[in-house]
A protein has these predicted regions:
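Membrane-embedded alpha-helical segments of integral membrane proteins
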Residues: 97-150
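Membrane-interface segments at or immediately adjacent to transmembrane helices
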Residues: 172-226
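Perimembrane loop-to-helix junctions flanking transmembrane segments
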Residues: 42-58
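Functionalized membrane-embedded alpha-helices
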Residues: 11-33, 58-102
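Short, Lys/Arg-rich, polar N-terminal cytosolic tail immediately upstream
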Residues: 1-12
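Internal/C-terminal transmembrane anchor helices
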Residues: 153-183
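Membrane-interface helix-boundary motifs at transmembrane edges
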Residues: 81-88, 148-158
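Interfacial/capping segments of alpha-helical transmembrane domains
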Residues: 32-45
Length: 226
């Protein structure tokens, strides 16, 4: 009896983790796809934080933004429908295994204010992002360990059709939003937004302080002006 109950609990837990990860990956991939340039700028922020910006070709951040959106979205769809369970869960646990320590470093050193996990749609602090990733890593490890407990929503005869549709959909969405405007614009100054209201400093927030410095130098004489 205990064995059957444990088997049932593991199955429920695994599928709950599977659906949670599917929603997160689909949403994350989608919001990156609707604003590929915004994702590119965030990747450039990461490169600058690591000191790699000067050594990386200019086209790579944009290419990486497209690939990231497509991979996350497709993995989410694969998890949702239970397609290629072993391969999908392996990729998911590897991604979370890399992102979790990375976000811990971001939380400790704070080189950038927002990880960009969900684009401009949802803004999280670095510590909130790390906490989220710890939970998702546990979920990813669970679906990887008990991947055979994932209940497929489509048969193997039709899983290729779902996979192809997911790939074509997210590819088309990314290219359309690159050439046109985002179909869902999460940016702070989107069309129809009140720019004056958007520029207001929130109550209690510290205003940005700028310092202008001029350096006058002639031969060995040098003077700083503030």
């Amino acid at each position: 009896m205990e064995s059957k109950q444990l088997h049932s609990i593991i199955g429920i837990w695994t599928n709950a983790c599977r659906f949670l990860l599917a929603v997160v990956f689909i949403f994350s991939g989608f919001v990156k796809a609707v604003d590929p340039l915004g994702t590119q700028y965030k990747i450039q922020d990461y490169l600058e934080a690591f000191g790699w910006a000067a050594s990386v070709p200019a086209f790579l951040p944009f290419l990486a933004s497209i690939l990231q959106a497509m991979v996350e979205f497709c993995l989410g769809v694969y998890l949702l429908f239970g397609i290629r369970r072993r391969m999908t869960t392996l990729f998911v646990v590897l991604i979370m295994g890399v992102m979790t320590p990375l976000t811990l470093w971001l939380a400790l050193s704070n080189p950038i204010s927002d990880c960009g996990c969900f684009g401009d749609a949802v803004t999280l602090t670095n510590w909130e992002t790390f906490g989220k990733n710890v939970f998702l890593l546990i979920a990813a490890a669970s679906v990887f360990k008990w991947g055979n407990r994932i209940t497929p929503l489509v048969t193997k005869r039709f899983d290729w059709l779902v996979a192809m549709y997911a790939f074509l959909y997210i590819s088309g969405m990314t290219l359309y939003c690159y050439h046109e405007l985002p179909v869902f614009d999460f940016r702070p100054y989107h069309i129809g937004a009140d720019i004056r209201k958007g520029m207001e400093i929130p109550e209690g927030a510290k205003p940005t302080v700028y310092e202008t410095r001029f350096i006058l130098q002639k031969m060995e004489w040098r003077k700083n002006l503030h």
